[in-house]
UniProtKB/Swiss-Prot annotation:
The gene is cra. This is Catabolite repressor/activator. GO terms for biological process: regulation of DNA-templated transcription; response to fructose. GO terms for molecular function: DNA-binding transcription factor activity; transcription cis-regulatory region binding. Homotetramer. Disruption phenotype: Decreases expression of genes encoding virulence proteins. Decreases virulence in mouse. Residues 3-22 bind DNA. InterPro entries: Fruct_sucro_rep (IPR012781), HTH_LacI (IPR000843), Lambda_DNA-bd_dom_sf (IPR010982), Peripla_BP/Lac1_sug-bd_dom (IPR001761), Peripla_BP_I (IPR028082). Pfam families: LacI (PF00356), Peripla_BP_1 (PF00532). Keywords: Activator, DNA-binding, Repressor, Transcription, Transcription regulation. Global transcriptional regulator, which plays an important role in the regulation of carbon metabolism. SUPFAM superfamilies: lambda repressor-like DNA-binding domains (SSF47413), Periplasmic binding protein-like I (SSF53822). Residues 1-58 form the HTH lacI-type domain.
Length: 334
């Protein structure tokens, strides 16, 4: 049923019916009797106004796009969960897309969200810093906010973890273990987040004489880490200390080790980005740093909504949020 039909059945003009349905009856001095006539028809025919159409007329769809690289990454899904809940409470719908850490996929996701006329976009980019894709919005008021992986700080605002500081803290803790063989397992070294985590690790390890083997997977996916680690084990012994730059990479290592040996060595010291309570069941020492997911989501949404309320482009810059350190495995029981 359309608004014209509601007006006809209530015996009022289309404009008056619109005022009543959109809660503007008092503002335009529509009588209580007329309001009741219109609302009686609305209730009888279970009429619901088209929110999308109303938003488009106002230049808004009350929708926000979110592009993340991996839906299996629990850190991203937790942040997405908080974002969706908080956006919904504020009357916005969150449209989620996954780039699978592929630049071409990410660019298509962005284009599709723009075709849906979202009011803003939140993105955890898989594009290298020098890529020109986002520069078209460098001087555009359309709000694009970077999550977890920073965009050009001169033109965009980013909310990220303190990757370098967190990696340095984590590596300092790992250094306390008497391991002789050390493996650093990262991925996609061309990404700023990967570079910063490696820099933090190297800073912590610079005065340590123990040699570190550096491995880089071609994606942050569990399967990519498993394939790389399995091949590496063909020519190397199991390391005594392991540093992984994401939880999915650690899962790949665990998959290979469990298939091969049936368990993780009890003397393997693990340090990882990402956390899960199930790590407490391991018999080896585990150090994990985890994002403060709620804090990250609240800060990102605060920036987005402020830019929509003004409206104005978010102020360029970088907000770093430190991660929490957790002691898991046998460390949780000591």
């Amino acid at each position: 049923m359309k608004l014209d039909e509601i007006a006809r059945l209530a015996g009022v003009s289309r404009t008056t019916a619109s005022y009543v349905i959109n809660g503007k009856a008092k503002q335009y001095r529509v009588s209580d009797k007329t309001v009741e006539k219109v609302m009686a028809v609305v209730r009888e025919h279970n009429y619901h106004p088209n929110a999308v159409a109303a938003g488009l007329r106002a230049g808004r769809t009350r929708s926000i796009g979110l592009v993340i690289p991996d839906l299996e990454n629990t850190s991203y899904t937790r942040i997405a969960n908080y974002l969706e809940r908080q956006a919904r409470q504020r009357g916005y719908q969150l449209l989620i897309a996954c780039s699978e850490d592929q630049p071409d996929n990410e660019m298509r996701c962005i284009e599709h969200l723009l075709q849906r006329q979202v009011d803003a976009i939140i993105v955890s980019t898989s594009l290298p810093p020098e890529h020109p894709f986002y520069q078209r919005w460098a001087n555009d008021p359309f709000p694009i906010v970077a999550l977890d992986r920073a965009l050009d700080r001169e033109h965009f605002t980013s909310v990220v973890g303190a990757d370098q500081d967190d990696a340095e803290m984590l590596a300092e803790e790992l250094r306390k273990f008497p391991a002789e063989t050390v493996l650093y397992l990262g991925a996609l070294p061309e990404l700023s987040v990967s570079f910063l985590r490696e820099q933090g690790f190297r800073t912590a390890w610079k005065d340590d004489p123990r040699e570190v083997n550096f491995l880089y997977a071609n994606s942050y996916e569990r399967e990519a880490a498993a394939q790389l680690f399995e091949k590496w084990l063909e020519t190397h012994p199991m390391p005594q200390a392991l540093f992984t730059t994401s939880f999915a990479l650690l899962q790949g290592v665990m998959d290979v080790t469990l298939r091969r040996d049936g368990k993780l060595p009890s003397d393997l010291a693990i340090a990882t980005f990402g956390d899960h309570e199930l790590l407490d069941f391991l018999q080896c020492p585990v150090l994990a740093v985890a994002q403060r997911h709620r804090d990250v989501a609240e800060r990102v949404l605060e920036i987005v909504l402020a830019s929509l309320d003004e409206p104005r482009k978010p102020k360029p810059g970088l907000t770093r949020i430190r991660r929490n350190l957790y002691r898991r495995g046998i460390l949780s029981r000591s």
